[in-house]
Regions:
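Conserved nucleotide-sugar phosphate-binding/catalytic loop shared by glycosyltransferases and other
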Residues: 2-10, 27-78, 214, 296-299
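Active-site-proximal region of nucleotide-activated glycan assembly enzymes
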Residues: 4, 31-32, 53-54, 114-166
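A short, glycine/small-residue-rich beta-strand->loop->alpha-helix junction that serves as a flexible
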Residues: 7-20, 186
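Donor-nucleotide binding loops and adjacent catalytic segments primarily
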Residues: 36, 41-51, 161, 168-247, ...
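Glycosyltransferases and closely related glycan-assembly transferases
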Residues: 49-54, 84-99, 107-122, 135, ...
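Acidic donor-binding loop of glycosyltransferase active sites
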Residues: 243-257, 265
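Short hydrophobic beta-strand element within catalytic cores of glycosyltransferases
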Residues: 250, 266-277
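C-terminal alpha-helical cap of glycosyltransferases
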Residues: 309-315, 326-343
């Protein structure tokens, strides 16, 4: 195809994982890629020195949601000025295709795509509840892809092949993994410490990702309890850690949820209660309604329910998780985008 493709969006890991999947697929097909993200968030840490990119641009953009009065006006004005910058960039690099993965980072480049005649905008919505930016711009998109939308041309979620490669069917719970994410989740950490003594008595091993801020407290507490645990704050070996586990306790961000599915790992989800539009709860509810996971809100956490879950038929759930997601999602999405560009 002529020209380069713009990938835009980020701010948080969930958006950035999907951006990375698109970059990898397009790069492997020999297509030039420009990434447009924000200085505020994790975008720069992910892509500043990425050799797969023709260019990486980080704009001083901030979210508009939850702002009021003058703050909201200034944020909107900032987005408009950055959108005009993106328009000039599109002309310079002959940009006709923009892929947005959402998040406040995506706003300027997405609006610029809408304003540019002949530009095709594609949106990937990660969550069961559409983000504010995507709600506003979806009507202008050539196509919107979502794992939670029955009308989406591709319903599978872009997940790294590692999670599929390490997948296995579980029969019995010998190891439980607690995943609070790289930022950690005190709620999950405290719950793990509460159930750890009984897990030890049952002969069940524990893997625990605490997040950086809570690592020393949790590690010290396990030592005081005399329980040997594979406890860590952050790891690049999460697919391998998942593979070692037979059951998981986790937040329900979209990327994490589908990674666990790809690994065929039965999971007890505890959604982050302050997630926008309560999307983590509704992400997990899609699986819960199919009998493919266990789900409790933070305020309803119940040790008895947890132990009932690990003693349930995890073999059946693990087998059914295999067919809940296919490994070629990003390839199928890019095929559709490239095919549309030929029209």
């Amino acid at each position: 195809m002529n020209g380069s493709v713009v990938i835009t969006g980020g701010g948080t890991g969930g958006h950035l994982k999907v951006a990375d999947a698109f970059i990898e697929e397009l790069y492997n097909r020999g297509i030039g890629i420009i990434f447009i993200g924000s200085l505020n968030g994790h975008d720069k840490a992910w892509f500043q020195n990425d050799k797969r990119l023709k260019k990486a641009i980080f704009l001083d953009t901030k979210g508009v949601v939850n702002k009021k009065g003058l703050g909201k006006f200034l944020s909107l004005f900032n987005i408009l000025s950055k959108a005009l910058y993106c328009l000039n960039l599109y002309s310079k690099y002959n940009i006709k295709t923009v892929i947005s993965v959402g998040g406040f980072s995506a706003a300027p480049a997405t609006f610029a795509s809408i304003l540019k005649f002949g530009s095709n905008l594609y949106i990937h919505e990660q969550n069961s509840r559409m983000g504010k930016l995507n709600q506003l711009t979806a009507k202008f998109a050539t196509e919107v892809f979502s794992s939670f939308d029955e009308n989406s041309l591709v319903k599978d979620y872009p997940v790294s092949s590692e999670f599929f490669n390490y997948a296995r069917v579980r029969d019995k719970v010998k190891t439980v993994a607690f995943f609070g994410g790289s930022q950690g989740a005190i709620c999950i950490n405290d719950f793990a410490l509460k159930v750890a003594p009984k897990l030890q008595k049952m002969g069940i091993n524990i893997i625990h990702q605490t997040g950086k801020n809570d690592f020393m407290r949790v590690k010290t507490k396990y030592e005081e309890l005399g329980i040997k645990v594979d406890v860590f704050d952050f790891s690049k070996q999460i697919p391998l850690k998942m593979s070692t586990a037979d059951f998981a306790v986790s937040r329900a961000g979209a990327s994490t949820l589908w990674e666990l599915c790809a690994n065929s790992l039965p999971t007890f989800f505890i959604p982050y209660k302050y997630a926008a539009s309560d999307h983590q709860y509704y992400n997990a509810k899609v699986l819960k309604d199919k009998g493919l996971c266990f789900l409790k809100r933070e305020d309803e956490l119940d040790e008895e329910y947890f132990f009932e879950a690990i003693n349930s038929d995890i073999h059946k759930i693990s087998i059914e998780l295999i067919s809940s997601i296919n490994p070629n999602a990003i390839s199928l999405i890019v095929n559709i985008i490239l095919q549309n560009n030929k029209k």
